[in-house]
């Protein structure tokens, strides 16, 4: 077996409890309770959604051109809000802008692709360029079928929420290894 990927690919996941220092996560998280700053977000104990937002922004700042996301290790509320939740709790009362609303914008504006492994949320079929099903551990291309099925369940949410722009690539300084 062989595996090939872009050298700039980054695995993105929720990491409850991780620390975050001075990250601009406004692209995904805004208007936190008690006026907590998301332009210079810092915490010693991030939630699943704020940690995944920080991981995503850090990957972008490091120059990643490919985000690798597994639904199983993601914060559900970071990835998507279903239409019933959007109807009951208005978007302006919810601090999280779900990844599904930003994934196309990331590609359009920053040329950042996403590979998402999902098994329970078909809403991503609406924004996918390609859908591959694993059938008995073998990949099977099913984009046409997935897009056709998705038409029966139209997304009612607006995908790109506002005009917050991502920051330019930030220089990441790595510690030097000692001999």
Question: Language model features by range: what are they?
Answer:
Residues 1-62, 66, 73-75:
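Phosphate-binding glycine-rich loops and their immediate beta-loop-alpha structural context
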Residues 43-47, 90-93, 110-111:
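Short, flexible loop segments at the rims of nucleotide/cofactor-binding pockets, characterized by
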Residues 59-103, 107-108, 120-126, 130-145:
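Conserved P-loop NTPase nucleotide-binding/switch module
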């Amino acid at each position: 077996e062989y595996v090939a990927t872009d050298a700039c690919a980054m695995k993105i996941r929720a990491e409850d409890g991780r620390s975050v220092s001075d990250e601009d996560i406004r692209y995904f998280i805004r208007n936190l309770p008690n006026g907590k700053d998301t332009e210079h977000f810092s915490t010693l104990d991030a939630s699943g959604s704020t940690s995944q937002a920080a991981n995503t922004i850090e990957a972008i700042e490091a120059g990643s051109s490919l985000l690798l996301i597994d639904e199983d290790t993601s914060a559900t509320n970071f990835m998507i809000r279903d239409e019933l939740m959007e109807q009951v709790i208005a978007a302006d009362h919810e601090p999280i802008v779900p990844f599904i609303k930003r994934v196309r914008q990331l590609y359009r504006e920053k040329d950042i692709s996403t590979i998402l492994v999902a098994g329970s949320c078909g809403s991503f079929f609406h924004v996918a360029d390609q859908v591959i099903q694993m059938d008995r551990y073998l990949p099977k291309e099913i984009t046409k079928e997935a897009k056709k099925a998705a038409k029966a369940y139209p997304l009612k949410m607006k995908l790109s929420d506002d005009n917050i722009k991502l920051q330019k690539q930030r220089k990441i300084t790595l510690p030097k290894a000692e001999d």
